[in-house]
């Protein structure tokens, strides 16, 4: 379906008083549609009353998930950014074939192969974080102006699990120990509310240089946790590190279920 057709369909469901939690990208940049990572920006659900007013609904609304690639790197960046604002970042993602709806049986060309381009992914990976980091102003979510993010997105011969290599610079550089402590101690709304799908520990850091690995860690905590490793200082940026998440669990279906649980816990399905 075309994007305008999907937008119209989702609005029809909402106007029929059916809450819509969507993985589709059609409404991601609609100003009064929240694009929520439950552990990062749960407060964005507060835009729903404004959206309901526009749609003329009492119970129906539209909420969307961000692109699956963001789930690998944005959580690790976002929780640091809450205390130490990030000035700029370079992100390269290495995305599994299941992100294209494929398996090695249906896409044999990907065996022993790599494709250095995924249509539309780089634009999503640069722009969508700014909405997640945005603020509610009146009846809309206004995107953040920073950090400046530049990305490259590659398709790699892995069945499941999106990986990211991240370089970040800060307005005021924290110590490595401060970053590690932020990752270790962070708990978001899903953990505080004990949502059924939420991982007990959202962010897991691995000290070993060869960790995390897709085959070993993508299913951590039911595929809902984010794995991080190799944090170290960089010669051009302040720090660099790698991240991993399960793209069809945390990044898609599982994340959508967790998001629905958050809306239910906050009374938006009543």
Regions found by a protein language model. Give the residues of each.
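Glycine-rich phosphate/pyrophosphate-binding beta-alpha loops
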Residues: 154-158, 245-250
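Short, charged, low-complexity patches
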Residues: 122, 249-253
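N-terminal Rossmann-like NAD(P) cofactor-binding subdomain of oxidoreductases
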Residues: 1-110, 114-117, 146-148, 220, ...
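C-terminal substrate-binding/catalytic lobe of Rossmann-fold NAD(P)-dependent oxidoreductases
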Residues: 88-93, 97-240
């Amino acid at each position: 379906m075309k994007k305008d057709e999907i937008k119209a369909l989702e609005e029809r469901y909402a106007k029929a008083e059916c809450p819509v939690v969507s993985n589709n990208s059609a409404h991601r940049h609609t100003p009064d549609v929240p694009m929520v990572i439950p552990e990062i920006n749960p407060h964005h659900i507060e835009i729903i009353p404004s959206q309901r007013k526009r749609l003329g609904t009492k119970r129906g609304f539209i909420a969307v998930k961000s692109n699956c690639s963001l789930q690998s790197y944005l959580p690790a960046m976002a929780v640091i950014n809450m205390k130490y604002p990030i000035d700029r970042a370079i992100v390269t993602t290495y995305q599994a074939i299941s992100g294209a709806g494929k398996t090695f049986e249906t896409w044999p060309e990907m065996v022993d192969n790599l494709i250095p381009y995924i249509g539309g992914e780089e634009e999503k990976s640069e722009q969508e974080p700014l909405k997640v980091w945005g603020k509610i102003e009146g009846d809309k979510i206004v995107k953040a102006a920073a950090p400046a993010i530049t990305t490259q997105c590659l398709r790699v011969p892995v069945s499941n699990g999106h990986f990211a290599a991240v370089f970040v610079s800060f307005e005021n550089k924290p110590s490595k120990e401060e970053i590690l402590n932020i990752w270790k101690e962070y708990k978001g709304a899903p953990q505080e509310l004990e949502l059924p799908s939420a991982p007990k520990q959202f962010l897991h850091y691995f000290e070993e240089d060869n960790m995390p690995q897709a085959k070993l860690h993508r299913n951590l905590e039911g595929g809902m946790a984010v794995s991080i490793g190799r944090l170290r200082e960089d010669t051009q940026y302040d720090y660099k590190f790698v991240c991993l998440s399960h793209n069809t669990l945390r990044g898609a279906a599982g994340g959508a279920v967790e998001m629905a649980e958050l809306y239910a816990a906050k009374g938006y399905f009543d």
